Structures are given as structure tokens and as C-alpha cells.
Amino acid sequence: LGAFDLSMDHRYVAWSMDTAGDERYTLRIRDLATGDELDDRLDEISNAGVAWSRDGEWLYYVTPDPQERPSTVWRHRIGTPRVDDVRVFDETDERFFVSVGTTRSEDWTVIHTASRTSSETLHVAADRPTDDATVVLERRPDVEYGIDHWGDSFVMHTNDDAVDFRLLVAAADDDWTQPDAWTELVAHEAGRRILGADAFAGHLVIHEWYRAQPRMRILFRDRTERIVDLGAEPHDVEPSANPQWDTELLRFTVQSLTMPTTLFDEHVTTGERTLLRRVPTPNVDLDDYVAERVWATAGDGTAVPVDVVRHVDTPIDASAPGVLYGYGAYEMSLPPWFSVARLSLLDRGYVWALAHPRGGGELGRQWYLDGKLLAKTNTFDDTIACAEHLVASGIVDANRLAVRGGSAGGLLVGACMTRRPDLFCSVVAEVPFVDIVSTMSDPTLPLTVTEWEAWGDPREEPYATYMLGYSPYDNTVPADYPAVYATAGLNDPRVSVHEPAK
């Protein structure tokens, strides 16, 4: 299931599905009064959002280019043939991916186009769907931004003059397509990575990573604020849909290595919290497990966080088998998550650890920048340092440590294996991206062009030499490698099936 969006009058729901796993979706529209599907059928669309007009007569959607890049926004009138659909926006720069959505206030349709390093936003009033889309601020190199509607104002989330992002505000009745219409609302703070802000009638909910932990901060219109307190144990927190514009309740989920996904409502002003539901774990005593954060030291002296969970009866005496998981790419911050299946390992004396190497975003944008392009090997060195720390501190048995990762995390575990085959007894590589030089040299493949900003273009120096120096496929030599379990997706549009096979 991809899209699932109600029209504003709750007459229709637009929903899409992918039945082959190739991320090519078919969109249908259901009449909620009758339960019947309308004749409207939109095949071969992207899972990049949909947006309704206020009257429920028009629907915006996105289609891909031949490389499967979401590139074009269309406007479809309900009940009319697709051939009559209107092209609203077409992104010709192959580095940019397009999405469409609606502000929580339901007053604006927002089109967002973004590369790995810059972005641009366009808007259309939801009650004037046939108007042309207007650019908020023209795109600039290395500047990212997005907007949300906040009643009498608009809020912008941007890295302009702020590596870890800041928030700006502009009056709704001002010409906010001009840069000088925007004033600072939340200042930049190095190391506090602001991911975005959800606007509600009376407050903003700011989502950020701070000291390698995700958190939510509530900012009221009088500029006072409150942090949602979730304790010190490494955890994940995710907002729910929270579709209601004028509300004082915030719904979110929390989970950790020792706590199942738990749904809460919290009053934004008082902080009063109500537990709504926790994923049941029958016959499990959660007090049997303990989690902690430890810090490894990389070769250049950088401290790297590692989250560790074990059974309380598992001794720290270098006897426990262990699994180390990592990703470390695309500024993706990887919070700890709960897994019932993992409990089976922990009950049998295993230790499970989650590395946060450079290349992710856990410690701010600079943490990501220090693990991409010509600094990519920091990601592998950090993960190796995490493994060495687990061994040296007696948390795991030196001869029984496995490493696991998928996609770009498959590149990570492949590089760790070829660099330090002695450190791991086994490797789990899920849809691994291991032949990076060949893949990134072919601009006809899905994602390649936009990924040059993350990895570099191996058709040029110094990237060719640097990438060949760490590519797992190009650095496999006769050696005593650990056992490898590799998986592939037959129709995977990101990592083609032949790459894990290599």
C-alpha cells in the first residue's frame, strides 16, 4: 500500500498499491458512501504523495521518468479520462526527486523537489486548484528548505546559513516569495539537527536529533517551549499522523531496545500523557533485558555511539556471541527499535548492538558530511572501531561476532569484511550495494545521477581512485573470509538483483 488519502470532505479515499515490488503503483479512488471504486485508474505512478483540492474534485499525483525518478506532478479531475490530466510541474534535473502533499491546515498544496544537497518548494491554494504553482524561493546550490502553513504565517525549515538547520517565519499576507520576508524563529545550534516542524493552530512540534537521540520540542506562539521527556535510555520517537489542525493533543509512538512500540497521547501544554496501546509481548518479562549506550573510539579519535542490549543474565566476560548492525549513509539517523525476534537471540545469550557511524545523521549534519564522498571510509572505520570496542570491553566473544546491514548498509558490511575479515565470524548482507563503481558509472540506472552527490562520480577523479579503494567487489582477494549470507530483491529498483549476486 502506498497512498491512502481522504478527500477533505471525506467523500473519497485515494489509495495506491504495488503488487510486484518494483515501486510502480496503481492509484484508485473509492467512494466511501457506496464502497465502490470509481472508474478512475492511474497506473505507473510514483509513491511520492497525493493531494486533494478543497472541493474534492481534483487530485494531484506524481509519475516517474524512465529511470524511475519521481519527476512530474499532474492534476487529475475526478471522473475524467487520464488523457485530460494537466501537467503541473516537471522536474528536468535528474538529481531532483519530486513529491506532493497538503499542509495540515488543508489550505495549501505543496510541491517539493529535492536533490541530496538542495531543494525548492512550490505552492497552490487548495481552493484554487487550477492556478499555476508558484515557487516559494528559487533553488540555490547547497541550500535546502521546506515550508508549512501556520495560520497567519508560514514556517520555513532551512539550512541556509545553518548547517544543522533553523526555522524562519513569514507573515501569510506578506510576499513570502521574497527572501527578506522571512525572519528567524528558531536559531541554529551546532549539533542539534532540526529535521522539520509540524504546524498546528497554536503550536509547532519540532523534530530533531540532539546528542544522538531523537526528540520532540513543542514551541508555542508566545515563543515559550517544552521538550517531550522520554528518559535517557536510547529510544525512538515518531509522531503519528496527527491530522487535526486545532488540537492540544500530540499522538506519538515510542520504542526502545527493551520497550515495545507504545502509543501515547500527550497534552502539549500540561505534559499529561495517556498510554493508548502497547504492542503485546505475551510470556515476556521485559525486565529481563538491559540496554545501554557505549562509545567506541575511531582511529582519528572520534567518539562513536553504540547501543547495546542483552539479557540481564548474560555476563560481560568476553563469552557472549554478538551481532553488530549498521547503516551509516544518506544522513539517515538510525534509532534503536524493539524486535520480538531479537528476544530469542538475547534469551540464548547473544548481545545485539547498533552502531552509529559517520555517514548517518545522529550527531548532526557534520556527522553525515564526515562520512560521504571523499570521507566515506570513515563509515567503515567507525564500524570496525565499534566492533573492536565490543570485543575489548568484554561485551562479546572475539571469535563470535557477526555484522549485519542492508542496501547501503550492505556496502558497509562488505567493506568491513574486506578490510577486517579477521574481526567477524559471519556477515549478513541484505540487498547489499557492493559494486559501487560499476553502478555509479552508469547514469541510465535508477538513482545513479542523484546519488553522485552522496558518493561521487567514479567517471572522474579523485572519486574513481577513492571509490575503487573501498568498493567491496573490487577489494575481494584470496583470503579467509567469514561466512556470508546475502539476499537480493528480484524486482528491487534500488539495488538490482545482479549486484548482491556478485
Feature locations, PLM:
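A flexible loop/linker signature enriched in serine peptidases of the S9 family
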Residues: 17-26, 41-46, 62-72, 82, ...
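Hydrophobic beta-strand positions that form the internal "hydrophobic ladder"
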Residues: 13-15, 59, 109, 154-156, ...
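Non-catalytic accessory segments flanking enzyme active sites
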Residues: 1-5, 16, 96-149, 184, ...
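Short loop/turn segments that connect beta-strands within beta-propeller blades
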Residues: 31-35, 77-81, 125-129, 171-174, ...
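A short beta-strand motif characteristic of beta-propeller blades
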Residues: 36-42, 86-90, 132-137, 182-187, ...
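Active-site-proximal cap/loop segments of hydrolase catalytic domains
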Residues: 354-502
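A conserved hydrophobic secondary-structure block that centers on an alpha-helix together
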Residues: 1-50, 56, 201
